Amino acid sequence: MSMQSPVSVQLAPDSASTMVNCTIKSEEKKEPCHEAPQGAAPAVETQPGDPALASQDATNAKAPPQDCASPESSGSPEPKRPAASEAASGSQERLDFNRNLQEVVPAIEKLLSSDWKERFLGRSNVEAKDVKGTQESLAEKELQLLVMIHQLSALRDQLLTAHSEQKNMAAMLFEKQQQQMELARQQQEQIAKQQQQLIQQQHKINLLQQQIQQVNMPYVMIPAFPPSHQPLPVTPDSQLALPIQPIPCKPVEYPLQLLHSPPAPVVKRSGVAAHHPLQEPPQPLNLTAKPKVPELPNTSSSPSLKMNSCGPRPASHGAPTRDLQSSPPSLPLGFLGEGDAVTKAIQDARQLLHSHSGALENSPNTPFRKDLISLDSSPAKERLEESCVHPLEEAMLSCDMDGSRHFSESRNSSHIKRPMNAFMVWAKDERRKILQAFPDMHNSSISKILGSRWKSMTNQEKQPYYEEQARLSRQHLEKYPDYKYKPRPKRTCVVEGRRLRVGEYKALMRTRRQGARQSYTIPPQAGQAQVSSDILFPRAAGLPLARPLVEHYDPQGLDPNMPVIINTCSLREEGEGTDDRHSVADGEMYRYSEDEDSEGDEKSDEELVVLTD
């Protein structure tokens, strides 16, 4: 028996060993093979440690599942079908497992231990020993494998879904970025279009402003009409007869008719034609002087009075009463406002005129002052350009009202005027209206009236003038970007070692003149009046005086301590006589300049004053 047992094993290796291997394979698939012969099983059990058998088992374990089918066909026919079906299903599961394993190996390696591969592929001895275990252990292992397969498949599905979600999110983010970039580009295009439209609109506005300025550039001078409200005839040559529309302040009715009339010269001049107002260039408004439009000689008695104002005449005459009648006191004052301050200022001005004329009438030695109120102030430039026929006519033109100074219109070309403020814009037209109604009203009275009216106006009424002020300021800044306001210094003069201002100097001279008048012994004659007016009141354009008139004046009667103001223009034109030269040489010469006042009127650059002690 002992000799036959190994022989039987060696002789029938194909039958017994294959059946054992089939049994092992069936145990792995939860279907153990019980049809093995009884003689083969003890043979395997009696020699468990045989190396030949172990190697054979190892080779049979790696054999394909079709090897089990051939020995099973020779065995009993009962388990043939279940074994074949289980082998086919096992091979299919292994193929699926290998395919899934290749896909999810990187994720599995992180979850399992390092020796899982050897255990799973059966390369370790422990796996070989486990394979030979019981049916319960094999079933448990297979159950664990199935659970792991399901977990791996679920993990694979999760990874796939996460990957697809990431792709979708990336696509959505890219689309959002594209949309944002498109919106930003559209916004930039819209902003560029709007900026271009704004630039075009600004250009159009500038063009319109230039056109408006060109239309409103020439100032139309309104003539001062006589007190008789008769409309003057209009010639067909005057194509500019348009109603002047001032800036609206208060809706009032104006009784005067704003019509243009051809002017007539006041005095006949040789070789000089009468200037038509349509041919004159537009000139800035002189706020202190009266309008330069000449009056018709047949409409008022003031020209005839002006002819006799500075000439030789008897002492007793009725000129002041006629001059006062020339100013229209009966005009309605509706356009001047309804306030008490306005009417009070006008009444004060009239009382001042009456008192001044009465004082001049009572003083016998100053007949030349009686008609100074009714004289118009004409520019010195026109007087110098025009040739005079008679010295008395030129003297009439050169007399100024109440000693007021005349300034030449030809200022320095580099002088830049300041832009007008809101009050000046409003007062420009209002001053014209007041001068039309009251040609003889003094500038100070007009300023009081305008100031009281401006204070009584509301902010809503002042708003358009403030807007005009802003427009003029912008225009001035564009025209003169480097302009800087430099006020002129105050006028001062040194008298007897003291530096006095102009007001103090005038007050001092006034008191000294009043004291000097009392010491005069010369009878009041026209010649003396002419000389004294020329000496005491300097004029912008002096006239050569006749020698008998100069000799008629006695300088010995003056106070020796009183400085006398001598007109230097008349000194130059008289040929510089000996007495005058000595007075200029012995005297002190001072130059003082006029500071700009608030009304923006024209002033002379410098005035030469010669003081002799």
UniProtKB/Swiss-Prot annotation:
Cross-referenced SUPFAM superfamilies: HMG-box
Gene that this polypeptide is encoded by: Sox13
Name of the featured protein: Transcription factor SOX-13
InterPro entries xref list: HMG_box_dom, HMG_box_dom_sf, SOX/SOX-like_TF
Chief site of localization: nucleus
Expression across tissues: Expressed in beta-cells in pancreatic islets of Langerhans (at protein level). Expressed in a subset of invariant natural killer (iNK) T-cells (at protein level). Expressed in oligodendroglial cells in the spinal cord (at protein level). In the hematopoietic system, expressed in gamma-delta T-cell lineage, specifically in immature Vgamma2-positive gamma-delta thymocytes, with expression decreasing upon maturation. Expressed in DN1d cells, a subset of DN1 (TCR, CD4 and CD8 negative, also known as TN1) thymocyte progenitors, and in DN2 (also known as TN2) thymocyte progenitors.
Keyword terms: Cytoplasm, Differentiation, DNA-binding, Nucleus, Phosphoprotein, Repressor, Transcription, Transcription regulation
Subunit details: Homodimer; homodimerization reduces DNA binding efficiency. Interacts with isoform 2 of TCF7/TCF1 (via N-terminus); inhibits WNT-mediated transcriptional activity. Interacts with HHEX (via N-terminus); abolishes the SOX13-mediated inhibition of WNT-mediated transcriptional activity via competitive inhibition of the SOX13-TCF7 complex.
